[in-house]
C-alpha cells in the first residue's frame, strides 16, 4: 500500500497551443484521477506550463518531493531522435533518481511474460535492487513470468535476489 499519494503530471509547452493543450492535459488527468480513485489509490494532479518540458518535470519532482518518475512514451509513429537526446540528457542531468520510461501497447492484465535486458555491470549502479524489486513486484502482481538477459555474474545476483525476496515470482 502507498503511504502517500501518486502525482500525475502533464507538462505543456508555453506556446500558441498552450490553452488547448492545457485543457486536454487536464481532461486526461481528470480521467486518470477517476481511475486511481476507483482503485483506492490517492492521487494529486497538476498541469504545468513550461518553456522546457524536462525543466517542468524536474521542478514538479522537487516540489512534490517525489522518489521516482514513471513516464509514458507518446504514441507518435515517428520519434524525433534529437528530442530524446536533448530531453533525456536534460532530465538525467537534473535528477539522480530512478526514471522509468514505458510504452504500454496492450492491457497489463494480458501480459504473460516480461523480458528484461540488463546492461553490462548494471549491478554496480545505484538503484539496481530498487528497479529489480519493482519489476519482480509487477511480475508477481500480473502473475506472469519474467526472464532476465545479461552477463552471468549479474544474472546470478538477480536470481538470488528474486529467489530470496520474491519466491512466488517465476
What label would you give each PLM region?
Residues 38-69, 165-170:
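Structural beta-alpha unit
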Residues 1, 67-160, 165-169:
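Intrinsically disordered or low-complexity boundary/linker segments at protein termini
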